[in-house]
């Protein structure tokens, strides 16, 4: 069985997360890149009519971003909901809300997609600043996914709530793309949207886990996986330093400040894009013990990297991972 090699790296350049891919396919392959969902996206498609397939995928991602999920676009569905404290929603949006609310509940609120107002105070995607604690407390008073009421064809939440699909939107896009590829004659594909990747096909893939302290092209370990979705969340993606302290973009919903769970990065492997994306954030904030238990509850595999350069690997990946940087080691079990 031939193997396709994927080297994954997430870096922050001008506050844009970039994933670098190196994939070897046979002939009849199309490669393209574009910008959407506030990040760089890349496609590598192998199959019949791959040029047309690539164009459709790009249009799908751009439409999903601007017309549905973007809270910055005043004409999107999410912006409409935020401006009206909820409203009627279609079946797909209902399904996404349902999944994320379940993750919120099972993570004991450590995953929360109503922190848009808090995130805006930090502005990690722009100037990046340390907000006043009073402003953070005020913003937190207008958050809390547990306050969302999801009904058959509608959703409602409190005044001044800002629902933000940023921690799950890329995974949602991967699920939509996978469903589309299933209906085409595509043999193999690698789709990268920020820190989330769809590995599509029946052959093995080798995925490099980025070195949190190294350059964009370096990795600390390699995973051998079948077709799946892989999402990584790391404090190195977007951050700034002030008075000798580093502030990263992954916020703890309980405090409104960057998580201090002792985790440097989390990689989640799942057949579901939305789960891989949302759980990578949830597990980062929960920490290793509770995060591992949460991922296991959803049938997902994980690799945690802690502050001591130790890798904590779930049972299903232990025979599929090798360390490639000798300064890192596996945690003692």
Where are these regions (language model features)?
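Mature catalytic core of soluble alpha/beta enzymes
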Residues: 2-333
